[in-house]
């Protein structure tokens, strides 16, 4: 089974990064939880993945996947995004160098660039997902 290796950088602090290895069959929901956990944040806010990375136009992205798409039954208005619970990593990232913007917490706007940097084969001795590398100290999620 193939694993995907990602480099995730804080958008406005590119020197702070995490490398994560995860199965391509994992949902975007699970991936979001792993990213947030790798930065020691609480996984307690809405989030989305967007194909538009530059500027503040990510909501106009051609491809977008948001938690709100999975909350239609709870009275949440449709955003035109696809599901994060039903979409697999392998459906979004196809080639090394593919990038998406990850927005966590629509109030505080934590932005991350998520770039596929490689593929690897599953190692039965390793538990996945795996944080492969941490560079830089993660900021505090809340400035209390």
Task: Label each region the model flagged.
Residues 1-144:
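Short linear regulatory motifs enriched in tryptophan with gly/pro/ser
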